Amino acid sequence: MNAIVALCHFCELHGPRTLFCTEVLHAPLPQGAGSGDSPDQVEQAEEEEGGIQMSSRVRAHSPAEGASSESSSPGPKKSDMCEGCRSLAVGHPGYISHDKETSIKYVSHQHPNHPQLFSIVRQACVRSLSCEVCPGREGPIFFGDEQHGFVFSHTFFIKDSLARGFQRWYSIIAIMMDRIYLINSWPFLLGRIRGIISELQAKAFKVFEAEQFGCPQRAQRMNTAFTPFLHQRNGNAARSLTSLTSDDNLWACLHTSFAWLLKACGSRLTEKLLEGAPTEDTLVQMEKLADLEEESESWDNSEAEEEEKAPVTPEGAEGRELTSCPTESSFLSACGSWQPPKLTGFKSLRHMRQVLGAPSFRMLAWHVLMGNQVIWKSRDVNLVHSAFEVLRTMLPVGCVRIIPYSSQYEEAYRCNFLGLSPPVPIPAHVLASEFVVVVEVHTATRSNLHPAGCEDDQSLSKYEFVVTSGSPVAADRVGPTILNKIEAALTNQNLSVDVVDQCLICLKEEWMNKVKVLFKFTKVDSRPKEDTQKLLSVLGASEEDNVKLLKFWMTGLSKTYKSHLMSTVRSPTATESRS
Protein backbone atom coordinates (compact mmCIF):
# COMPACT_ATOMS: atom_id res chain seq x y z
CA MET A 1 0.00 0.00 0.00
CA ASN A 2 1.45 3.38 -0.99
CA ALA A 3 0.93 5.18 2.30
CA ILE A 4 2.77 6.69 5.25
CA VAL A 5 1.94 5.84 8.86
CA ALA A 6 3.18 8.29 11.48
CA LEU A 7 3.04 8.83 15.24
CA CYS A 8 2.57 12.49 16.21
CA HIS A 9 2.79 14.32 19.54
CA PHE A 10 1.58 17.70 20.80
CA CYS A 11 4.54 19.12 22.67
CA GLU A 12 3.84 21.69 25.40
CA LEU A 13 6.85 23.70 24.26
CA HIS A 14 6.94 23.28 20.46
CA GLY A 15 3.41 22.33 19.44
CA PRO A 16 2.54 19.45 17.05
CA ARG A 17 5.57 17.36 16.10
CA THR A 18 6.13 14.14 14.16
CA LEU A 19 7.81 11.52 16.32
CA PHE A 20 8.04 8.47 14.09
CA CYS A 21 6.91 7.54 10.57
CA THR A 22 7.09 4.48 8.33
CA GLU A 23 6.98 4.70 4.54
CA VAL A 24 6.99 2.24 1.65
CA LEU A 25 9.86 2.20 -0.84
CA HIS A 26 9.58 0.43 -4.18
CA ALA A 27 12.84 1.93 -5.48
CA PRO A 28 16.37 1.44 -4.10
CA LEU A 29 16.93 2.81 -0.61
CA PRO A 30 17.91 6.47 -0.30
CA GLN A 31 21.35 7.42 0.86
CA GLY A 32 21.73 7.33 4.62
CA ALA A 33 19.08 4.68 5.19
CA GLY A 34 21.14 1.70 6.23
CA SER A 35 23.87 2.27 3.61
CA GLY A 36 27.58 2.36 4.18
CA ASP A 37 27.49 0.26 7.32
CA SER A 38 30.56 -1.75 8.12
CA PRO A 39 30.34 -5.03 10.06
CA ASP A 40 32.01 -3.44 13.10
CA GLN A 41 29.54 -0.55 13.23
CA VAL A 42 26.29 -2.42 12.60
CA GLU A 43 24.18 -4.51 14.91
CA GLN A 44 21.54 -6.45 13.02
CA ALA A 45 18.59 -8.11 14.68
CA GLU A 46 16.52 -10.02 12.15
CA GLU A 47 13.30 -11.91 12.58
CA GLU A 48 10.51 -13.19 10.37
CA GLU A 49 6.97 -11.93 10.82
CA GLY A 50 4.28 -12.18 8.15
CA GLY A 51 6.78 -12.65 5.33
CA ILE A 52 8.72 -9.50 6.30
CA GLN A 53 12.37 -9.63 7.27
CA MET A 54 12.90 -7.11 10.07
CA SER A 55 16.30 -5.42 10.24
CA SER A 56 17.21 -2.71 12.72
CA ARG A 57 20.50 -0.96 12.05
CA VAL A 58 22.25 1.18 14.61
CA ARG A 59 25.66 2.72 14.08
CA ALA A 60 27.83 5.17 15.93
CA HIS A 61 28.42 8.47 14.21
CA SER A 62 31.11 10.96 14.85
CA PRO A 63 30.07 14.51 15.83
CA ALA A 64 30.94 15.70 12.35
CA GLU A 65 28.71 13.10 10.76
CA GLY A 66 25.89 13.99 13.12
CA ALA A 67 26.18 17.66 12.27
CA SER A 68 26.22 17.02 8.53
CA SER A 69 23.24 14.70 8.68
CA GLU A 70 21.33 17.18 10.81
CA SER A 71 21.94 20.03 8.38
CA SER A 72 20.79 17.98 5.39
CA SER A 73 17.66 16.63 7.08
CA PRO A 74 14.37 18.31 6.16
CA GLY A 75 13.17 17.99 9.78
CA PRO A 76 13.49 20.59 12.56
CA LYS A 77 16.88 21.48 13.97
CA LYS A 78 18.20 19.98 17.19
CA SER A 79 17.78 23.29 18.98
CA ASP A 80 14.06 23.26 18.17
CA MET A 81 13.53 19.79 19.65
CA CYS A 82 13.18 18.68 23.23
CA GLU A 83 13.20 15.21 24.70
CA GLY A 84 9.47 14.83 24.09
CA CYS A 85 9.84 15.80 20.39
CA ARG A 86 12.57 13.28 19.65
CA SER A 87 12.22 9.56 19.05
CA LEU A 88 15.47 8.26 17.56
CA ALA A 89 18.85 9.31 18.85
CA VAL A 90 21.04 11.64 16.83
CA GLY A 91 22.79 9.64 14.11
CA HIS A 92 20.35 6.73 14.25
CA PRO A 93 19.77 5.64 10.61
CA GLY A 94 16.28 4.30 11.28
CA TYR A 95 14.72 0.89 10.80
CA ILE A 96 14.38 -1.10 7.58
CA SER A 97 12.18 -4.10 6.79
CA HIS A 98 12.53 -6.20 3.64
CA ASP A 99 9.45 -7.92 2.26
CA LYS A 100 10.78 -11.02 0.51
CA GLU A 101 7.48 -11.70 -1.26
CA THR A 102 7.20 -8.36 -3.06
CA SER A 103 10.75 -6.93 -2.77
CA ILE A 104 9.29 -3.87 -1.02
CA LYS A 105 11.17 -2.07 1.75
CA TYR A 106 9.54 -0.41 4.74
CA VAL A 107 11.71 2.37 6.17
CA SER A 108 11.11 4.17 9.46
CA HIS A 109 12.60 7.53 10.50
CA GLN A 110 11.53 10.38 12.68
CA HIS A 111 10.79 12.40 9.53
CA PRO A 112 10.60 11.44 5.83
CA ASN A 113 13.80 12.16 3.93
CA HIS A 114 12.01 13.60 0.91
CA PRO A 115 11.16 17.30 1.39
CA GLN A 116 7.76 17.00 -0.29
CA LEU A 117 6.78 14.02 1.85
CA PHE A 118 8.03 15.83 4.93
CA SER A 119 5.77 18.77 4.11
CA ILE A 120 2.74 16.48 3.62
CA VAL A 121 3.36 14.60 6.87
CA ARG A 122 4.05 17.82 8.75
CA GLN A 123 0.79 19.40 7.61
CA ALA A 124 -1.19 16.26 8.44
CA CYS A 125 0.44 16.18 11.89
CA VAL A 126 -0.49 19.79 12.63
CA ARG A 127 -4.08 19.33 11.47
CA SER A 128 -4.54 16.08 13.38
CA LEU A 129 -3.50 17.72 16.67
CA SER A 130 -5.14 21.11 16.22
CA CYS A 131 -8.27 21.58 14.11
CA GLU A 132 -9.11 18.11 12.73
CA VAL A 133 -10.23 16.36 15.91
CA CYS A 134 -13.37 14.48 16.85
CA PRO A 135 -15.56 15.41 19.86
CA GLY A 136 -13.75 14.60 23.08
CA ARG A 137 -10.36 15.07 21.39
CA GLU A 138 -9.85 11.30 21.32
CA GLY A 139 -10.92 9.07 18.45
CA PRO A 140 -10.74 8.59 14.64
CA ILE A 141 -11.37 11.21 11.99
CA PHE A 142 -10.89 11.53 8.22
CA PHE A 143 -9.74 14.64 6.36
CA GLY A 144 -7.60 15.73 3.42
CA ASP A 145 -7.63 16.88 -0.20
CA GLU A 146 -6.22 15.92 -3.59
CA GLN A 147 -3.15 18.14 -3.25
CA HIS A 148 -1.93 17.21 0.23
CA GLY A 149 -3.32 13.69 0.43
CA PHE A 150 -6.05 12.12 2.53
CA VAL A 151 -5.50 11.31 6.19
CA PHE A 152 -6.92 8.80 8.64
CA SER A 153 -6.14 10.21 12.09
CA HIS A 154 -6.73 8.69 15.53
CA THR A 155 -5.94 10.94 18.50
CA PHE A 156 -5.40 9.55 22.00
CA PHE A 157 -3.95 10.42 25.42
CA ILE A 158 -1.00 8.91 27.26
CA LYS A 159 -0.78 9.14 31.05
CA ASP A 160 2.07 11.29 32.44
CA SER A 161 2.35 12.22 36.08
CA LEU A 162 4.38 15.34 35.23
CA ALA A 163 2.13 16.74 32.48
CA ARG A 164 -0.73 19.20 32.72
CA GLY A 165 -3.86 17.20 33.42
CA PHE A 166 -1.69 14.11 33.97
CA GLN A 167 -1.77 13.22 30.27
CA ARG A 168 -0.13 14.00 26.94
CA TRP A 169 -1.77 14.17 23.51
CA TYR A 170 -0.71 11.90 20.64
CA SER A 171 -2.08 10.78 17.30
CA ILE A 172 -1.42 8.03 14.76
CA ILE A 173 -2.06 9.07 11.17
CA ALA A 174 -2.17 7.17 7.86
CA ILE A 175 -1.69 9.30 4.73
CA MET A 176 -2.64 8.23 1.21
CA MET A 177 -3.38 9.90 -2.12
CA ASP A 178 -6.15 7.41 -2.92
CA ARG A 179 -9.28 8.57 -1.10
CA ILE A 180 -11.46 5.59 -2.05
CA TYR A 181 -8.84 3.07 -0.96
CA LEU A 182 -8.35 4.81 2.38
CA ILE A 183 -12.08 5.00 3.07
CA ASN A 184 -12.50 1.31 2.25
CA SER A 185 -9.62 0.55 4.63
CA TRP A 186 -11.24 2.49 7.51
CA PRO A 187 -12.55 -0.56 9.47
CA PHE A 188 -9.24 -2.39 9.14
CA LEU A 189 -7.11 0.61 10.10
CA LEU A 190 -9.39 1.53 12.98
CA GLY A 191 -9.18 -1.90 14.58
CA ARG A 192 -5.42 -2.31 14.19
CA ILE A 193 -4.49 1.23 15.22
CA ARG A 194 -6.72 0.99 18.28
CA GLY A 195 -4.82 -2.14 19.22
CA ILE A 196 -1.51 -0.27 19.01
CA ILE A 197 -2.93 2.62 21.03
CA SER A 198 -4.31 0.32 23.73
CA GLU A 199 -0.91 -1.32 24.12
CA LEU A 200 0.83 2.05 24.48
CA GLN A 201 -1.75 3.30 26.96
CA ALA A 202 -1.49 0.12 29.04
CA LYS A 203 2.29 0.45 29.31
CA ALA A 204 2.08 4.14 30.18
CA PHE A 205 -0.64 3.54 32.77
CA LYS A 206 1.57 1.06 34.62
CA VAL A 207 4.37 3.63 34.77
CA PHE A 208 1.90 6.33 35.84
CA GLU A 209 0.53 4.20 38.69
CA ALA A 210 4.03 3.35 39.88
CA GLU A 211 5.03 7.02 39.93
CA GLN A 212 1.84 8.04 41.67
CA PHE A 213 2.31 5.37 44.30
CA GLY A 214 5.90 6.39 44.94
CA CYS A 215 5.33 10.15 44.95
CA PRO A 216 1.75 11.41 44.60
CA GLN A 217 1.78 14.59 42.49
CA ARG A 218 -1.81 15.77 42.86
CA ALA A 219 -1.50 17.05 46.44
CA GLN A 220 1.84 18.64 45.66
CA ARG A 221 0.36 20.54 42.69
CA MET A 222 -2.66 21.68 44.66
CA ASN A 223 -0.37 23.15 47.34
CA THR A 224 1.86 24.87 44.79
CA ALA A 225 1.31 28.64 44.56
CA PHE A 226 -0.27 29.84 41.32
CA THR A 227 1.97 31.77 38.92
CA PRO A 228 1.00 33.18 35.52
CA PHE A 229 4.38 32.27 34.02
CA LEU A 230 5.11 28.99 32.29
CA HIS A 231 7.67 26.92 34.07
CA GLN A 232 8.96 23.38 34.06
CA ARG A 233 7.80 21.10 36.83
CA ASN A 234 10.60 19.13 38.46
CA GLY A 235 12.84 20.34 35.63
CA ASN A 236 11.40 17.81 33.12
CA ALA A 237 8.26 19.14 31.44
CA ALA A 238 8.98 17.19 28.21
CA ARG A 239 9.36 13.45 28.63
CA SER A 240 9.96 11.00 25.82
CA LEU A 241 7.48 8.28 25.00
CA THR A 242 10.05 5.63 25.88
CA SER A 243 10.27 7.00 29.42
CA LEU A 244 6.49 7.26 29.70
CA THR A 245 6.10 3.58 28.74
CA SER A 246 9.39 2.36 30.22
CA ASP A 247 10.07 0.45 26.99
CA ASP A 248 13.53 0.81 25.46
CA ASN A 249 12.46 -1.19 22.37
CA LEU A 250 9.40 0.97 21.77
CA TRP A 251 10.47 2.38 18.39
CA ALA A 252 11.54 -1.02 17.05
CA CYS A 253 8.15 -2.44 18.08
CA LEU A 254 6.33 0.51 16.48
CA HIS A 255 8.30 -0.01 13.28
CA THR A 256 7.26 -3.67 13.25
CA SER A 257 3.62 -2.76 13.84
CA PHE A 258 3.56 0.01 11.21
CA ALA A 259 5.33 -2.15 8.60
CA TRP A 260 2.88 -5.01 9.16
CA LEU A 261 -0.02 -2.54 9.02
CA LEU A 262 1.10 -1.24 5.62
CA LYS A 263 1.67 -4.73 4.24
CA ALA A 264 -1.59 -6.21 5.55
CA CYS A 265 -3.70 -3.24 4.50
CA GLY A 266 -2.25 -3.39 1.01
CA SER A 267 -2.86 -7.15 0.74
CA ARG A 268 -6.47 -7.21 1.88
CA LEU A 269 -7.73 -5.02 -0.99
CA THR A 270 -6.68 -5.76 -4.56
CA GLU A 271 -7.74 -4.22 -7.85
CA LYS A 272 -9.42 -6.52 -10.37
CA LEU A 273 -10.13 -5.91 -14.03
CA LEU A 274 -13.86 -6.11 -14.66
CA GLU A 275 -14.58 -7.00 -18.28
CA GLY A 276 -18.32 -6.49 -18.05
CA ALA A 277 -21.06 -8.58 -19.60
CA PRO A 278 -20.16 -10.98 -22.45
CA THR A 279 -20.68 -9.70 -25.97
CA GLU A 280 -23.10 -11.26 -28.44
CA ASP A 281 -20.20 -12.87 -30.30
CA THR A 282 -19.06 -14.54 -27.08
CA LEU A 283 -22.57 -15.81 -26.31
CA VAL A 284 -23.00 -17.21 -29.82
CA GLN A 285 -19.63 -18.97 -29.67
CA MET A 286 -20.55 -20.49 -26.30
CA GLU A 287 -23.87 -21.71 -27.69
CA LYS A 288 -22.18 -23.29 -30.72
CA LEU A 289 -19.65 -24.99 -28.47
CA ALA A 290 -22.46 -26.34 -26.28
CA ASP A 291 -24.30 -27.63 -29.37
CA LEU A 292 -21.18 -29.42 -30.58
CA GLU A 293 -20.67 -31.03 -27.16
CA GLU A 294 -24.30 -32.16 -27.11
CA GLU A 295 -23.97 -33.60 -30.59
CA SER A 296 -20.79 -35.48 -29.72
CA GLU A 297 -22.45 -36.92 -26.61
CA SER A 298 -25.45 -38.06 -28.64
CA TRP A 299 -23.15 -39.77 -31.14
CA ASP A 300 -21.29 -41.51 -28.32
CA ASN A 301 -24.56 -42.69 -26.78
CA SER A 302 -25.88 -44.00 -30.09
CA GLU A 303 -22.65 -45.89 -30.73
CA ALA A 304 -22.82 -47.40 -27.25
CA GLU A 305 -26.41 -48.54 -27.85
CA GLU A 306 -25.44 -50.12 -31.16
CA GLU A 307 -22.63 -52.02 -29.47
CA GLU A 308 -25.02 -53.28 -26.78
CA LYS A 309 -27.44 -54.59 -29.41
CA ALA A 310 -24.55 -56.54 -30.99
CA PRO A 311 -26.14 -57.20 -34.39
CA VAL A 312 -25.21 -60.33 -36.27
CA THR A 313 -23.04 -59.64 -39.29
CA PRO A 314 -24.70 -61.06 -42.41
CA GLU A 315 -22.83 -63.24 -44.81
CA GLY A 316 -20.96 -61.33 -47.44
CA ALA A 317 -20.77 -58.24 -45.30
CA GLU A 318 -17.40 -59.10 -43.86
CA GLY A 319 -14.65 -56.65 -44.67
CA ARG A 320 -17.07 -53.78 -45.23
CA GLU A 321 -17.14 -50.87 -42.80
CA LEU A 322 -20.35 -48.90 -42.44
CA THR A 323 -19.97 -45.23 -41.57
CA SER A 324 -22.80 -43.00 -40.45
CA CYS A 325 -23.47 -39.87 -42.44
CA PRO A 326 -23.56 -36.62 -40.44
CA THR A 327 -26.90 -34.91 -40.19
CA GLU A 328 -27.71 -31.56 -41.73
CA SER A 329 -27.67 -29.83 -38.34
CA SER A 330 -24.20 -31.12 -37.59
CA PHE A 331 -23.05 -29.98 -41.00
CA LEU A 332 -24.41 -26.48 -40.45
CA SER A 333 -22.90 -26.22 -36.98
CA ALA A 334 -19.57 -27.36 -38.35
CA CYS A 335 -19.84 -24.70 -41.03
CA GLY A 336 -20.62 -22.02 -38.48
CA SER A 337 -17.67 -22.95 -36.30
CA TRP A 338 -15.26 -23.39 -39.18
CA GLN A 339 -11.82 -22.02 -38.41
CA PRO A 340 -9.65 -21.64 -41.52
CA PRO A 341 -5.95 -22.36 -41.35
CA LYS A 342 -3.48 -19.50 -41.37
CA LEU A 343 -2.16 -19.68 -44.92
CA THR A 344 -0.99 -17.26 -47.58
CA GLY A 345 -3.59 -15.13 -49.29
CA PHE A 346 -5.45 -12.06 -48.11
CA LYS A 347 -3.95 -10.61 -44.94
CA SER A 348 -6.53 -8.00 -43.97
CA LEU A 349 -9.45 -5.96 -45.26
CA ARG A 350 -7.04 -3.24 -46.32
CA HIS A 351 -5.03 -5.81 -48.24
CA MET A 352 -8.17 -7.10 -50.00
CA ARG A 353 -9.27 -3.57 -50.87
CA GLN A 354 -5.92 -2.84 -52.48
CA VAL A 355 -5.99 -6.11 -54.45
CA LEU A 356 -9.59 -5.91 -55.68
CA GLY A 357 -9.72 -2.17 -56.13
CA ALA A 358 -11.94 0.29 -54.29
CA PRO A 359 -15.13 -0.12 -56.44
CA SER A 360 -15.07 -3.93 -56.44
CA PHE A 361 -14.30 -4.06 -52.72
CA ARG A 362 -17.17 -1.70 -51.92
CA MET A 363 -19.59 -3.88 -53.91
CA LEU A 364 -18.36 -7.02 -52.15
CA ALA A 365 -18.44 -5.43 -48.68
CA TRP A 366 -21.96 -4.09 -49.29
CA HIS A 367 -23.27 -7.59 -50.08
CA VAL A 368 -21.47 -9.04 -47.05
CA LEU A 369 -23.02 -6.49 -44.67
CA MET A 370 -26.48 -6.91 -46.19
CA GLY A 371 -26.41 -10.69 -45.65
CA ASN A 372 -26.37 -11.62 -49.33
CA GLN A 373 -24.64 -14.75 -50.53
CA VAL A 374 -20.95 -14.35 -51.41
CA ILE A 375 -19.58 -16.97 -53.82
CA TRP A 376 -15.87 -17.37 -54.53
CA LYS A 377 -14.83 -19.53 -57.49
CA SER A 378 -11.16 -20.44 -57.52
CA ARG A 379 -8.89 -23.44 -57.86
CA ASP A 380 -6.77 -22.13 -54.98
CA VAL A 381 -8.52 -23.39 -51.85
CA ASN A 382 -6.16 -21.47 -49.57
CA LEU A 383 -7.05 -18.22 -51.31
CA VAL A 384 -10.77 -18.84 -50.73
CA HIS A 385 -10.14 -19.67 -47.08
CA SER A 386 -8.17 -16.46 -46.53
CA ALA A 387 -10.85 -14.39 -48.27
CA PHE A 388 -13.60 -15.76 -46.01
CA GLU A 389 -11.45 -15.29 -42.94
CA VAL A 390 -11.03 -11.60 -43.79
CA LEU A 391 -14.63 -10.93 -44.84
CA ARG A 392 -16.19 -12.57 -41.80
CA THR A 393 -14.61 -9.93 -39.54
CA MET A 394 -17.20 -7.43 -40.80
CA LEU A 395 -20.11 -9.48 -39.42
CA PRO A 396 -21.21 -10.68 -35.99
CA VAL A 397 -20.38 -14.30 -35.31
CA GLY A 398 -24.04 -15.29 -35.34
CA CYS A 399 -24.46 -14.01 -38.90
CA VAL A 400 -21.62 -16.07 -40.37
CA ARG A 401 -22.45 -19.35 -42.13
CA ILE A 402 -19.56 -20.69 -44.17
CA ILE A 403 -19.16 -23.63 -46.50
CA PRO A 404 -15.47 -23.23 -47.28
CA TYR A 405 -15.25 -25.34 -50.44
CA SER A 406 -17.95 -27.40 -52.09
CA SER A 407 -18.28 -29.52 -55.21
CA GLN A 408 -21.82 -28.30 -55.82
CA TYR A 409 -23.82 -25.13 -55.35
CA GLU A 410 -25.49 -24.70 -51.95
CA GLU A 411 -28.59 -22.59 -51.38
CA ALA A 412 -28.33 -19.20 -49.68
CA TYR A 413 -30.30 -20.31 -46.62
CA ARG A 414 -27.52 -22.78 -45.82
CA CYS A 415 -24.59 -20.41 -46.14
CA ASN A 416 -23.78 -16.81 -46.92
CA PHE A 417 -20.14 -17.61 -47.75
CA LEU A 418 -19.64 -20.34 -50.34
CA GLY A 419 -16.43 -21.53 -51.97
CA LEU A 420 -16.68 -23.37 -55.30
CA SER A 421 -14.37 -24.91 -57.81
CA PRO A 422 -14.44 -23.13 -61.21
CA PRO A 423 -16.12 -26.04 -63.09
CA VAL A 424 -19.07 -26.10 -60.65
CA PRO A 425 -22.10 -24.57 -62.41
CA ILE A 426 -24.19 -21.89 -60.73
CA PRO A 427 -27.92 -21.75 -61.59
CA ALA A 428 -28.89 -18.93 -63.94
CA HIS A 429 -31.46 -17.47 -61.55
CA VAL A 430 -28.76 -17.24 -58.89
CA LEU A 431 -26.39 -15.37 -61.18
CA ALA A 432 -29.17 -12.93 -62.06
CA SER A 433 -30.23 -12.45 -58.45
CA GLU A 434 -29.60 -9.14 -56.74
CA PHE A 435 -28.90 -11.00 -53.49
CA VAL A 436 -25.78 -12.79 -54.76
CA VAL A 437 -22.28 -11.57 -55.57
CA VAL A 438 -19.77 -13.78 -57.38
CA VAL A 439 -15.99 -13.36 -57.25
CA GLU A 440 -14.25 -15.31 -60.01
CA VAL A 441 -10.52 -15.82 -59.74
CA HIS A 442 -8.71 -16.34 -63.04
CA THR A 443 -5.07 -16.81 -63.82
CA ALA A 444 -3.73 -13.57 -65.22
CA THR A 445 -2.18 -13.72 -68.68
CA ARG A 446 0.52 -11.26 -67.66
CA SER A 447 1.82 -10.66 -64.14
CA ASN A 448 1.30 -6.93 -64.46
CA LEU A 449 -2.42 -7.18 -65.26
CA HIS A 450 -3.45 -7.08 -61.64
CA PRO A 451 -0.45 -6.40 -59.40
CA ALA A 452 -0.94 -6.91 -55.69
CA GLY A 453 1.64 -4.35 -54.67
CA CYS A 454 0.77 -4.25 -50.98
CA GLU A 455 2.42 -5.59 -47.86
CA ASP A 456 5.28 -6.94 -49.93
CA ASP A 457 3.10 -9.92 -50.94
CA GLN A 458 3.35 -10.90 -54.59
CA SER A 459 1.48 -14.21 -54.22
CA LEU A 460 -1.74 -12.65 -55.58
CA SER A 461 -0.17 -10.93 -58.57
CA LYS A 462 -0.77 -14.03 -60.71
CA TYR A 463 -4.53 -13.79 -60.26
CA GLU A 464 -7.20 -11.65 -61.83
CA PHE A 465 -10.38 -10.98 -59.79
CA VAL A 466 -13.76 -10.36 -61.43
CA VAL A 467 -16.60 -9.25 -59.13
CA THR A 468 -20.12 -9.49 -60.61
CA SER A 469 -23.63 -9.22 -59.23
CA GLY A 470 -27.20 -9.03 -60.47
CA SER A 471 -27.53 -5.76 -58.51
CA PRO A 472 -24.28 -3.84 -58.74
CA VAL A 473 -23.87 -1.11 -56.15
CA ALA A 474 -23.88 2.30 -57.78
CA ALA A 475 -20.84 4.43 -57.11
CA ASP A 476 -22.95 7.31 -55.88
CA ARG A 477 -25.02 5.15 -53.52
CA VAL A 478 -24.65 6.18 -49.90
CA GLY A 479 -24.71 2.65 -48.52
CA PRO A 480 -24.93 1.67 -44.86
CA THR A 481 -23.26 3.96 -42.36
CA ILE A 482 -20.97 1.26 -41.04
CA LEU A 483 -19.60 0.58 -44.56
CA ASN A 484 -18.63 4.23 -44.98
CA LYS A 485 -16.87 4.20 -41.61
CA ILE A 486 -15.04 0.99 -42.48
CA GLU A 487 -13.81 2.45 -45.76
CA ALA A 488 -12.71 5.63 -43.98
CA ALA A 489 -10.64 3.55 -41.55
CA LEU A 490 -9.12 1.46 -44.34
CA THR A 491 -8.10 4.51 -46.38
CA ASN A 492 -6.51 6.22 -43.37
CA GLN A 493 -2.88 5.18 -43.68
CA ASN A 494 -2.08 6.59 -40.25
CA LEU A 495 -4.01 3.68 -38.71
CA SER A 496 -2.21 0.36 -38.47
CA VAL A 497 -3.90 -2.95 -39.23
CA ASP A 498 -4.31 -3.68 -35.51
CA VAL A 499 -5.95 -0.31 -34.91
CA VAL A 500 -8.33 -0.91 -37.82
CA ASP A 501 -9.27 -4.28 -36.32
CA GLN A 502 -10.11 -2.64 -32.98
CA CYS A 503 -12.07 0.05 -34.79
CA LEU A 504 -14.06 -2.66 -36.56
CA ILE A 505 -14.85 -4.36 -33.26
CA CYS A 506 -16.15 -1.08 -31.84
CA LEU A 507 -18.31 -0.47 -34.90
CA LYS A 508 -19.84 -3.94 -34.68
CA GLU A 509 -20.59 -3.47 -30.98
CA GLU A 510 -22.20 -0.10 -31.70
CA TRP A 511 -24.51 -1.54 -34.34
CA MET A 512 -25.27 -4.69 -32.36
CA ASN A 513 -26.53 -2.43 -29.56
CA LYS A 514 -28.86 -0.81 -32.08
CA VAL A 515 -29.98 -4.27 -33.18
CA LYS A 516 -30.81 -5.18 -29.59
CA VAL A 517 -32.89 -2.04 -29.14
CA LEU A 518 -34.76 -2.68 -32.39
CA PHE A 519 -35.40 -6.33 -31.49
CA LYS A 520 -36.78 -5.37 -28.09
CA PHE A 521 -38.90 -2.64 -29.66
CA THR A 522 -40.39 -4.64 -32.52
CA LYS A 523 -40.33 -8.32 -31.60
CA VAL A 524 -40.87 -8.15 -27.85
CA ASP A 525 -42.94 -5.01 -27.32
CA SER A 526 -44.71 -5.25 -30.73
CA ARG A 527 -44.72 -1.50 -31.33
CA PRO A 528 -46.45 -0.05 -34.43
CA LYS A 529 -44.55 0.94 -37.57
CA GLU A 530 -44.83 4.66 -36.82
CA ASP A 531 -43.02 4.22 -33.52
CA THR A 532 -40.45 2.00 -35.21
CA GLN A 533 -39.67 4.72 -37.76
CA LYS A 534 -39.18 7.22 -34.95
CA LEU A 535 -36.86 4.80 -33.19
CA LEU A 536 -34.81 4.28 -36.36
CA SER A 537 -34.46 8.04 -36.72
CA VAL A 538 -33.22 8.28 -33.14
CA LEU A 539 -30.73 5.46 -33.77
CA GLY A 540 -29.48 7.17 -36.93
CA ALA A 541 -30.48 4.20 -39.08
CA SER A 542 -33.56 5.34 -40.97
CA GLU A 543 -31.98 4.86 -44.42
CA GLU A 544 -32.96 1.78 -46.44
CA ASP A 545 -29.55 0.14 -46.35
CA ASN A 546 -29.24 0.66 -42.60
CA VAL A 547 -32.67 -0.89 -42.01
CA LYS A 548 -31.76 -3.94 -44.12
CA LEU A 549 -28.50 -4.30 -42.22
CA LEU A 550 -30.25 -4.15 -38.84
CA LYS A 551 -32.79 -6.78 -39.89
CA PHE A 552 -30.05 -9.12 -41.10
CA TRP A 553 -27.90 -8.62 -38.02
CA MET A 554 -30.95 -9.36 -35.88
CA THR A 555 -30.62 -12.98 -37.00
CA GLY A 556 -27.21 -13.09 -35.33
CA LEU A 557 -28.52 -12.42 -31.83
CA SER A 558 -27.84 -15.24 -29.42
CA LYS A 559 -30.58 -17.55 -28.22
CA THR A 560 -29.62 -16.67 -24.67
CA TYR A 561 -30.34 -12.99 -25.21
CA LYS A 562 -33.63 -13.62 -27.00
CA SER A 563 -34.90 -16.06 -24.38
CA HIS A 564 -33.86 -13.71 -21.60
CA LEU A 565 -35.85 -10.86 -23.13
CA MET A 566 -38.92 -12.99 -23.70
CA SER A 567 -38.87 -14.45 -20.19
CA THR A 568 -38.39 -11.01 -18.66
CA VAL A 569 -41.32 -9.51 -20.54
CA ARG A 570 -43.63 -12.43 -19.80
CA SER A 571 -42.81 -12.60 -16.07
CA PRO A 572 -45.47 -11.32 -13.61
CA THR A 573 -43.07 -8.75 -12.15
CA ALA A 574 -42.43 -7.21 -15.55
CA THR A 575 -46.15 -7.15 -16.33
CA GLU A 576 -46.94 -5.32 -13.09
CA SER A 577 -44.19 -2.75 -13.65
CA ARG A 578 -45.41 -2.05 -17.20
CA SER A 579 -49.01 -1.67 -16.07
From Swiss-Prot:
Region (Disordered): 31-82, 294-323
Start and end residues of each dDENN FLCN/SMCR8-type domain: 493-558
Name of encoding gene: Flcn
TM annotation in the entry: none
PANTHER family cross-referenced by the UniProt entry: FOLLICULIN, FOLLICULIN FAMILY MEMBER
Subcellular locations according to the entry: Lysosome membrane; Cytoplasm, Cytosol; Cell projection, Cilium; Cytoplasm, Cytoskeleton, Microtubule organizing center, Centrosome
Regulation: GTPase-activating activity is inhibited in the folliculin complex (LFC), which stabilizes the GDP-bound state of RagA/RRAGA (or RagB/RRAGB), because Arg-164 is located far from the RagC/RRAGC or RagD/RRAGD nucleotide pocket. Disassembly of the LFC complex upon amino acid restimulation liberates the GTPase-activating activity.
Organism ancestry: Eukaryota, Metazoa, Chordata, Craniata, Vertebrata
Extent of Low complexity compositional bias: 63-76
Residue(s) at site: Essential for GTPase activation (GAP) activity: 164
Any GO BP: transforming growth factor beta receptor signaling pathway
PROSITE patterns: DENN_FLCN_SMCR8
Positions carrying Phosphoserine: 62, 73, 302, 406, 537, 542, 571
Function: Multi-functional protein, involved in both the cellular response to amino acid availability and in the regulation of glycolysis. GTPase-activating protein that plays a key role in the cellular response to amino acid availability through regulation of the non-canonical mTORC1 signaling cascade controlling the MiT/TFE factors TFEB and TFE3. Activates mTORC1 by acting as a GTPase-activating protein: specifically stimulates GTP hydrolysis by RagC/RRAGC or RagD/RRAGD, promoting the conversion to the GDP-bound state of RagC/RRAGC or RagD/RRAGD, and thereby activating the kinase activity of mTORC1.
Name this polypeptide is given: Folliculin
Major localization class: membrane
Acidic residues compositional bias, start-end: 294-308
